[in-house]
């Protein structure tokens, strides 16, 4: 399948490299010409274990390319991923200017039906704002037919283990609302991720708003576990208890489990 990914950052490059590894034809587009030049010169603007080798292999086999040309990327991709940053504003809310700007740019070049996939971490309701940007651009060109479907497919990657997480996912969450294009989009996404569903169905289908909230809820749950264990570690120090013993005692409960129960420096990073 032909895939375009807008945003050659952490999520975009890992997604692009892994999809190319699965045999898809991938174009990654970024507005940063220096970053694209680095990628075309076999460099990487980020570090992730195994990504350099993955990219080199797929460059050599002609399955992944990099460009600054949005028109080329939109024309190429049957499925177009939006994987740009959504940094926090001063008030803590997500800054969606890059996501919405990308949607507007895609809309200017749409000529035939595309599946637009929100991969960025975005607030609930963002898909509808993306949809409006796309439709506004089509309206300006006098195009009334339905040339896109906006869906949500949040990422669940850990820095340092992103390739493993992508290639061996716990689950693949896809938010798709009922529409005239539902069957077409469902089939395309099933085909895209078919490699992961051969022995066990990993795709969880839901509506778009639920998929957007799932990503936020997962992040919040993990943050809660990490913060909770750091508080218990502080309490252990005060009371003379051994936090490692406490951790093992808590984790042995099947309702809790051992993952993300290690006290440490807290949480953060571009991929939580």
Locate each region found by the language model.
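Structural/interface elements that position substrates and couple domains in central-metabolism enzymes
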Residues: 1-272
């Amino acid at each position: 399948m032909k895939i375009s990914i807008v945003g050659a950052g952490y999520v975009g490059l890992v997604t692009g490299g892994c999809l190319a590894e699965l045999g898809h034809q991938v174009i990654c587009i970024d507005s940063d010409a220096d970053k694209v030049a680095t990628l075309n010169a076999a460099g990487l603007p980020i570090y992730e274990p195994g990504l350099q080798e993955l990219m080199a292999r797929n460059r050599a086999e002609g399955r992944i390319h990099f460009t600054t040309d949005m028109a080329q990327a939109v024309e190429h991709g049957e499925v177009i991923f939006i994987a740009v940053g959504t940094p926090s504003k001063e008030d803590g809310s997500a800054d969606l200017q890059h996501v919405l700007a990308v949607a507007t740019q895609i809309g200017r070049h749409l000529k035939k039906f595309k599946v637009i996939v929100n991969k960025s971490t975005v607030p609930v309701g963002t898909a509808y704002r993306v949809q409006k940007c796309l439709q506004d651009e089509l309206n300006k060109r006098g195009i009334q037919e339905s040339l896109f479907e906006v869906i949500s497919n949040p990422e669940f990657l850990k820095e340092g283990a992103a390739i493993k997480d992508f290639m061996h996912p716990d689950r693949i969450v896809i938010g798709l609302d009922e529409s005239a294009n539902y069957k077409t989009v469902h089939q395309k996404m099933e085909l895209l991720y078919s490699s992961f569903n051969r022995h066990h169905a990993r795709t969880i289908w839901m509506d778009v708003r639920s998929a957007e909230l799932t990503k936020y809820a997962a992040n919040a749950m993990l943050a809660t576990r990490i913060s909770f264990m750091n508080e218990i570690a502080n309490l252990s120090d005060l009371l003379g208890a051994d936090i490692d013993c406490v951790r093992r005692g808590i984790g042995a409960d099947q309702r809790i489990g051992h993952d993300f129960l290690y006290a440490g420096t807290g949480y953060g990073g571009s991929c939580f």
